């Protein structure tokens, strides 16, 4: 049962990472369209879903300092 739980957690983390990457992509698209607030929200959501996603953190920091 512990193995099943560990596998479920692993699959969930993999799924959340995929979702976070999608939010980073949307953030980049918003940046390219000069939609700063939408980009910020997308990067924040990516970090919420997968806190160790460094690209979203870098992009968010850069946007917040503009």
Q: Residue ranges of each PLM-predicted region?
A:
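Conserved structural position within tetratricopeptide repeats
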Residues: 14, 47-48, 65
């Amino acid at each position: 049962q512990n193995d099943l739980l560990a596998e479920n957690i692993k699959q969930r983390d993999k799924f959340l990472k995929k979702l976070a990457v999608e939010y980073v992509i949307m953030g980049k698209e918003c940046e390219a369209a000069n939609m700063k607030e939408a980009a910020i929200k997308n990067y924040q959501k990516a970090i919420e879903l997968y806190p160790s996603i460094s690209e979203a953190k870098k992009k968010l920091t850069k946007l917040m300092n503009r």
